[in-house]
Amino acid sequence: MENMAFNQRTVVMIGPGEHYVTAKNEVIKTLLGSCVAVCLYDPKAQVIGMNHFLLAADRRKFTHFLDSRAGYYGVHAMEILINAMLKRGAQRKYLQSKIFGGANVLSLCADNILNHYDIGGMNIDFVRHFLQRERIPIISEDIGGHCGRVIYFDPTDYSVYRSLIEHKYEEIASLQDEEYRYFNQASEDIHSSGVPVVIWSD
């Protein structure tokens, strides 16, 4: 997690597997490819939070996801974020969400085992399913496609500012490398985690 000054405000940068919650005048930033970020906020308590995660298996090929490192996979990433929001004074009944990411970035890697996976689509499906189940409304979304995204979550009016990473080859390559390492770590965790636990299925 990285802090940066931006327009005389602190910008907190989060990476894969991380989350951040604040009731201060801080902007939360992340860089997304196939990963997804959920921006949660309670406008009454004036608390915001964001996570950044990627699921480790293709649900069309496997019957379950495995419970592994907390914060890395969907249900845990969401539960950790929601619980952190509640600890800061948010109330579940007032939570609203905005979702971003899920681009077809990892599958664009040449000679990549992920060419056969719809990682971005899987993450989008999961987030929608989870939020619907938890009755947390999705106010807006910017998802899918083939471009990476940089997003900034502004606590003053709960806006999320987004720019696409379209033609910046070095940034895309770096993003692919980071998410590929993240996916490999998730896969290693799956193989070493022992007894499988169903955490989401249609």
UniProtKB/Swiss-Prot annotation:
GO terms for biological process: chemotaxis. This is Probable chemoreceptor glutamine deamidase CheD 2. It comes from the Bacteria. It catalyses: L-glutaminyl-[protein] + H2O = L-glutamyl-[protein] + NH4(+). Its EC number is 3.5.1.44. The gene is cheD2. Probably deamidates glutamine residues to glutamate on methyl-accepting chemotaxis receptors (MCPs), playing an important role in chemotaxis. Belongs to the CheD family. The lineage of its organism: Bacteria, Pseudomonadati, Pseudomonadota, Gammaproteobacteria, Alteromonadales. Keywords: Chemotaxis, Hydrolase. CDD domains: CheD. It is an enzyme of class 3 (hydrolase). InterPro entries: CheD-like_sf, Chemorcpt_Glu_NH3ase_CheD, Cytotoxic_necrot_fac-like_cat. The keyword Membrane does not apply. One of its GO terms (molecular function) is protein-glutamine glutaminase activity.
